[in-house]
């Protein structure tokens, strides 16, 4: 039997961050858990919240680190080890400043683009070679600090679009699990 895939939604814990741009990964992970009909439980060895199940006929471990974004790797790496998931079978769902708001892109490896959550995961795993579901939040307006921008709630014009974007990102994640990176890229990047 094939080892599971590890699907991690990045975000920050706590109600203060729940509706911020930086928490899109958590929002999509919550949606995927709902599709599985399961509730997150704390994984004792890693401290992350996890759900196990099947997406697109594939065994998956869905996780949300319970630490702050810039420390995500300290919970993701132990999960990968516990479930014997190599980095290439890790999918990280995260917000992306370098994509227009609502745009979804799939990627394998590469740089972190200033994303501290990705940096932490790559450092803890010792490699950048893992899959990513990138969800565009766009660049901040004017000279606003990106670190401030990602921790703000979505703007009034953005807010109504967030549920649809999360649905599309969840669909993209399931497609990635089902058919693999290149075929999924061909379909998702045409949306």
Curated annotation (Swiss-Prot):
Site positions (Discriminates between blocked and unblocked aminoacyl-tRNA): 12
GO terms (BP aspect): protein quality control for misfolded or incompletely synthesized proteins; rescue of stalled ribosome
Subcellular location(s) per record: Cytoplasm
SUPFAM superfamilies, alphabetized: Peptidyl-tRNA hydrolase-like
EC category name: hydrolase
Residue(s) at site: Stabilizes the basic form of H active site to accept a proton: 95
Family under the similarity heading: Belongs to the PTH family.
Stated name of the protein: Peptidyl-tRNA hydrolase
Organism in which the protein naturally occurs: Mycobacterium marinum (strain ATCC BAA-535 / M)
């Amino acid at each position: 039997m094939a080892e599971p895939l590890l699907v991690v939604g990045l975000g920050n814990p706590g109600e203060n961050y729940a509706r911020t741009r930086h928490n899109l990964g958590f929002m999509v992970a919550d949606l995927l858990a709902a599709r599985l009909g399961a509730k997150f439980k704390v994984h004792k060895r890693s401290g992350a919240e996890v759900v196990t199940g099947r997406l697109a006929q594939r065994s998956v471990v869905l996780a949300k680190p319970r630490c702050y974004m810039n420390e995500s790797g300290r919970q993701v790496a132990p999960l990968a080890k516990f479930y014997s998931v190599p980095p290439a079978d890790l999918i990280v769902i995260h917000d992306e400043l370098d994509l227009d708001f609502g745009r979804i892109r799939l990627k394998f490896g590469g740089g972190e683009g200033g994303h501290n959550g990705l940096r932490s995961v790559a450092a803890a795993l010792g490699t950048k070679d893992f899959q990513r579901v990138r969800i565009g939040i766009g660049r901040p307006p004017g000279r606003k600090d990106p670190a401030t921008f990602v921790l703000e709630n979505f703007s009034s014009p953005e807010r109504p679009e967030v549920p649809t974007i999360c649905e599309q990102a969840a669909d993209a994640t399931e497609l990635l699990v089902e058919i693999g990176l290149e075929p999924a890229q061909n379909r998702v990047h045409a949306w």
